[in-house]
């Protein structure tokens, strides 16, 4: 009963955040429309031109603000001793490998961009975290001021004036969505991360661990080969926030990379508890691993179908190019459905994704798990053939 109530509370909080985010964007849209009507801009440019301006402006300024937001994280990080690892806008990622920048494709549900850095060494029980996390919102603030200034400097040109006003208002919306502590989509926003880190040094440590894991991944070091102390589970209280719960998720990924399926299942079951702040995208990841473990173990159809909830299927559509998802779907087709042709299609898709994936060490681990699936399928076929021959004799 308690767990059910906690789960409902998490879902309600997420829905409230979604509605609040939508209301912020709607409010900015209304403000822009009212401003253009009151200042006669709509009369000057016409309704159709205004709609075109809105469409072009929203798309253009959304990308501009996302780029500037991530650039703000980069500048904030560099000013406080962080080192560049990767910079992503949409699914395009620039990542440092062996001292050189290379372009790869990577996407994460709930994020329009991401700037990941290697943090300073852990000293005196802390690291600087405020400027790196707040840098994005601060950069959006500076951009808003610049766009409003441009709007008033170009006040005689109606459509340009309206265009830059739109850029400023959209920037305010993004500042509020990223700065007010809440979970946006499937991830915590910058404000929420800052709030949790200001409350607990243990959360700062969890933040540091996540960045270090990512930095080591970029150096092609597999998670199974990283220091064990990074994966010690935080307290139950600490894991009520997403930053600390992510360490538990990473511990599960490490167990999978070590091929320790019993430990991985134990950790996944634990991190899926409703009282933990495990983010929706991480809950999807954990459930995917549980499906894989079930396929490699007892392979019970009813258990597999129970994992594939409506929420899981929603994420599955978004994460269709994720290597772990493709590996698990491959196992489902081969071991669950006994359909090698369908499995081969998924394996071909995996190879396409692997060719442009930024973390080669993760692909190496996925290939090892795929090989385990193939070995199990081969063994089960041999058992069937052996039983058939025995029966015929």
Q: What are these model-derived regions, one by one?
A:
Residues 79, 88, 114-123, 182-259, ...:
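Polar-ligand-bearing catalytic/cofactor-coordination segments
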């Amino acid at each position: 009963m308690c767990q059910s109530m906690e789960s409902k509370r998490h879902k309600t909080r997420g829905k409230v955040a979604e509605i609040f985010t939508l209301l912020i964007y709607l409010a900015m849209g209304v403000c822009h429309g009212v401003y253009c009507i009151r200042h006669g801009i709509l009369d000057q440019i016409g309704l159709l031109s205004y709609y075109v301006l809105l469409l072009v402006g929203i798309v253009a300024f959304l990308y501009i603000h996302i780029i500037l937001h991530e650039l703000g994280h980069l500048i904030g990080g560099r000013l406080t001793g962080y080192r560049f690892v990767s910079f992503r806008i949409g699914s395009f990622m620039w990542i440092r490998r062996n001292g050189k920048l290379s372009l790869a494709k990577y996407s994460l549900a709930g994020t329009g961009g991401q700037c990941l850095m290697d943090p300073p060494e852990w000293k005196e029980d802390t690291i600087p975290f405020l400027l790196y996390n707040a840098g994005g919102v601060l950069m959006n603030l500076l951009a808003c001021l610049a766009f409003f200034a441009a709007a008033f400097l170009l006040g005689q040109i109606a459509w340009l004036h309206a265009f830059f006003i739109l850029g400023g208002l959209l920037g305010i919306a993004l500042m509020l969505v990223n700065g007010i502590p809440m979970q946006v989509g499937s991830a915590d926003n910058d404000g929420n991360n800052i709030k949790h880190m200001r409350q607990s040094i243990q959360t700062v440590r969890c933040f540091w661990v996540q960045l270090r894991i990512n930095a080591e991944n970029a150096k092609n070091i597999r998670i199974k080969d990283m220091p064990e102390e990074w994966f010690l589970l935080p307290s139950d209280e600490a894991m009520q926030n997403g930053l600390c719960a992510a360490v538990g998720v990473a511990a599960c990924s490490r167990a999978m990379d070590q091929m320790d399926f019993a430990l991985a299942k134990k950790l996944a079951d634990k991190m899926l508890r409703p009282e933990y702040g495990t983010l929706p995208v991480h809950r999807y990841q954990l459930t995917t691993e549980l499906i894989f473990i079930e396929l490699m173990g007892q392979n019970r159809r009813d258990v597999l179908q129970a994992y594939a909830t409506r929420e899981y299927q929603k994420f599955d559509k978004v994460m269709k190019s994720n290597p772990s998802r493709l590996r698990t779907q491959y196992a489902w087709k081969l071991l669950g459905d006994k359909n090698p042709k369908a499995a081969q299609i998924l394996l071909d898709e995996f190879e396409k994704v692997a060719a442009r994936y930024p973390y080669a060490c993760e692909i190496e681990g996925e290939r090892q798990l795929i090989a385990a699936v193939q070995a199990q399928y081969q063994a089960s076929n041999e058992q069937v053939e052996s039983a058939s021959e025995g029966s015929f004799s």
